[in-house]
Regions:
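Histidine- and acidic-residue-rich, metal-dependent catalytic cores
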Residues: 27-68
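Short, solvent-exposed segments of well-ordered alpha helices
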Residues: 24-28, 73-76
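Divalent metal-dependent phosphate-bond-processing catalytic cores, especially two-metal-ion Mg2+/Mn2+ enzymes
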Residues: 3-10, 46-50, 62-180
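Post-HEXXH active-site segment of zinc metalloproteases
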Residues: 4-24
């Protein structure tokens, strides 16, 4: 973002910045990534003849996670809802998702999320994955899944998604260097 300076990063609102502690990674900016993304779009495309920065920002807004309770965030079949579904499916159906649990866990450590969720190890994060999928994610991606079923590549993404959930639910051996 334009207002970023060495050691100071805008958090999405004009004039508001955050400093990262020594050794911090980009994961420390996770709480601000939606607002930073919207700000970047407005900086880059605001006033463009063809690209409507407000529409893009509205799509980005629905990728906010955890999903706010407001009714504006509950729609799943409009473009912003489908963008959120694509974001979630893209992360959770990634062919390498299963071996990313350790890195994701340490991002959670850096942001304090691991403490809030009670995770002490990458295995704790992995063990909680099926409940997270079924109780949190599933309701937000079904319209996206319906669209993915139209193509063979989309069906592969769906298969990846469900195979990851199945593997953890059925306690498949976990080798962080390979897939289940």
């Amino acid at each position: 973002c334009r207002d970023d300076q060495d050691g100071f990063y805008t958090i999405g609102a004009p004039g508001q910045t955050v400093t990262l502690p020594p050794g911090a990674t980009d994961a420390s900016l996770t709480p601000y990534h939606v607002d930073r993304g919207k700000l970047f779009v407005h900086e880059r495309f605001g006033g463009h003849n063809i690209i409507d920065a407000d529409i893009i920002a509205a799509n980005i807004e629905l990728t906010r996670f955890p999903v706010p309770e407001d009714s504006d965030y509950q729609e799943t079949g409009d473009y912003p809802g489908l963008v959120r579904a694509a974001d979630l499916i893209g992360q959770l159906a990634d062919p390498h998702h299963m071996r990313k649990f350790p890195a994701l866990f340490y991002e959670f450590v850096e942001t304090g999320t691991s403490i809030r969720l009670g995770y002490k190890t990458p295995g704790d994060l992995r063990d909680a994955y099926p409940a997270f999928y079924w109780n949190v994610v599933n309701r937000y991606i079904q319209d996206g899944v319906r669209h993915l079923r139209v193509t063979q590549e989309g069906k592969q993404w769906i298969a990846n998604l469900y195979s990851h959930v199945f593997a953890v639910e059925h306690h498949e051996p976990w080798n962080p260097g390979s897939q289940p």
